[in-house]
C-alpha cells in the first residue's frame, strides 16, 4: 500500500516551526550591542586608570628615593628623612580610607566579590579617588603591597560608574559590567589578559553569573584594557627572567614536593593574615587617630627597612628576576623570605589600601628558588635550573592561599613568557591546592569577605537596637 504524502500545509507548518527554533537559538545567543559597547568603554577606562595608577605610584616612589639620594652622604639626615617621608605618605593613605571610604581599605577584591552577590555596596564616587590616591601613598611609601588588588577594585567601580552614567537598570548588565571591570583591572595590572578572564571565572566562580552575555563582555573589556596597557608600556613580559630551560620528565616529582611544601605554608599564611588583622583591630579599636598613627609607624619602618635591606620591602616585582637568577644564597633567600612574610602580614593586615597578589608572587619566588638551589647539589645528575623552581613557586603560593590554581598558572606564564614550563607549573600548583584543601585551609579572599559581612551584620544589628532607645 502506498504511503500517504504529507500535504503542502504540513510542509509549511514544519518549515515555520524550524524557523522559529532557529530564531530562538539566535536570539538566545544574541548579546546586546549596548552591553558590549559599555564593556569596551569599561575596559578602556580600566586600562587608562591602570596605567595612570602604575605611573603615579612609580613617580611617588622616585620622588621619595630621589629626596633620600640628595642626603645619602649624611647619615644623620637620611635615616630620619626616610622614616618621615614614608610615614607621611602612608598616613595619607590610611587617613583617606578611614575618613572617606572604609571599603577602599585592604585589597578590595573581597569587596568586588561581595558586590557581585549584592551583599556589599559599590560607591564608586568615593572609592575611585580614595583608592587611587590612598594607593599612591601606601605603595609610594615602599610598603609591602601590590597594585593588583586596587586595580581590581578600581576596575569594578569603573564598571558600576559606566553603568550609572548610561543609566542602565538591568540587574544582568549591572553584574556583567562589574565583573568586566574587575577582570579588566587585573589584566591592566599584570599585562595578563587571559589571567584576568580566568580570575573572574575561577576565583569569583560563586559570584560570577556565567552566560553568553557576561563572558563576551568580559572578553571585550579585557581586550581593550590590554591594548591600552600595551600602547603605553609595550608588549614585553612584565617580569624579565629570560627563557629558562625545560624541566625533564625525571625531575617532575621534585615540583610535586615543592607544591606540597606550599600546600603546607598556604593555610598557615592565611591563618597568620587573619590573626594579624584581629591584632590590629584590637590595637586601634576603630579609633581613626590610632589607626592613622599606627599606619604612619608601619610606613616609616618600611622606609627605614628599605635603607637596610631594600629587597624586604616594596611590591616585589623588582626582586623576582634577581632572586630567580640565583644571585642569592639559600640562607639569604630564606632570610629575605621570612622578612617579607613578616612585612607582608603587617602591611596587608593593617588595612592599608593595597593588594597581596604581588607580595605572594615574590614570596613564592623566594621559597621556590631556595628549594631549587638546595636540590641542585643533592641531585647533580638532574642538571637542575633553580629558575624553573622560582617560576613554579610563584604560582604555587597563590594556588594554596587564594585557591585559584588555574589563574596562578596562567598569570605567571603570561608575566614571565615561559610557557614551556606549563607542565611543572600544573604539577606544583595542583600539589599545593590539594594539600592545602586536605589540611582544611580556606580561600583567603572568601574568608575575608565572610568576616566583612559578619562585621556588617553586627553593625546593622547594633544600629537597629540603638534606634528604639533614641526614640524613647
UniProtKB/Swiss-Prot annotation:
It is a multi-pass membrane protein. InterPro entries: Cl-channel_ClcA, Cl-channel_core, ClC. It is found in: Cell inner membrane. The record marks 148 as: Mediates proton transfer from the outer aqueous phase to the interior of the protein. Chloride binds at residues 107, 356-357, 445. Residues 70-76, 233-252, 310-329, 377-386 are periplasmic. The chain crosses the membrane at residues 33-69, 77-100, 124-141, 148-166, 215-232, 253-281, 288-309, 330-349, 355-376, 422-438. GO terms for cellular component: plasma membrane. SUPFAM superfamilies: Clc chloride channel (SSF81340). Disulfide bonds: none annotated. GO terms for molecular function: antiporter activity; voltage-gated chloride channel activity. Keywords: Antiport, Cell inner membrane, Cell membrane, Chloride, Ion transport, Membrane, Transmembrane, Transmembrane helix, Transport. The record marks 203 as: Mediates proton transfer from the protein to the inner aqueous phase. Its main location: membrane. It catalyses: 2 chloride(in) + H(+)(out) = 2 chloride(out) + H(+)(in). A motif (Selectivity filter part_1) lies at residues 106-110. It holds the Pfam family Voltage_CLC. A motif (Selectivity filter part_3) lies at residues 355-359. A motif (Selectivity filter part_2) lies at residues 146-150. Residues 109-116, 177-189, 193-201, 387-401, 402-404, 405-416, 417-421 dip into the membrane without crossing it. PANTHER family: CHLORIDE CHANNEL PROTEIN. Belongs to the chloride channel (TC 2.A.49) family. ClcA subfamily. NCBIfam families: PRK05277.1. Homodimer. This is H(+)/Cl(-) exchange transporter ClcA. It comes from Klebsiella pneumoniae subsp. pneumoniae (strain ATCC 700721 / MGH 78578). The gene is clcA.
